[in-house]
């Protein structure tokens, strides 16, 4: 690996969204997104797929900590202790979205997109993804 950032092209993103949709449809599940640094791009990619209304429930864009707490029930303590860009926060975001909607799957993302805002501990480009289902959650 070169260590250089990579980007996913539109065709690859669409193919990935189709695959996610196919798997969700096959399971009879619906998904909710809880996004910060992506500002709605995940749910946009998913809803670009025809028929996505059968498996996409909704998407939250919670850019601020206030929105994370208000809309997704992320605790102030988690944000104070770990920050918005952390494993703990994305797990709370995913679980909060799942609880708010009652669907079967949630994805959450929070990161430091740049060009500024990074620190030595969390440089620009740091991103956490979290997934939640009724019986478990992972990052």
Predicted regions and their residues:
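Short alpha-helical segments enriched in small residues
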Residues: 1-139
